[in-house]
Amino acid sequence: VVLLASGCATAPPPTEQMASAKAAVESAAVDGAPAYAPAETRLASDKLAAAQKAVVAKDYVLAKQLAEESQLDAQLAVRKMQTAKSSKAADEARKAASTGGTQ
């Protein structure tokens, strides 16, 4: 148990994970994910903010975990957005095909 506790205390700041999470959250926002996956986008932002607070508190293990979760939530938001856009485009194509272009 002592080794595990000392391993946590010497964990380095999760600089790479924080940068990746921030980039993923920003990219999701710019791409329009909040309109299609608001819950996932908000969760990603909230976890990133919590990770930043954990870094300030020097709880690097928690910060790394939250940053990784934030990145995954942002990626999920983007995937949901892409799925919704693809579905909408397919519906529009079917609609256009069924009218036979008689507009």
Sequence positions of predicted segments:
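Long, charged/polar, soluble alpha-helical segments
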Residues: 4-103
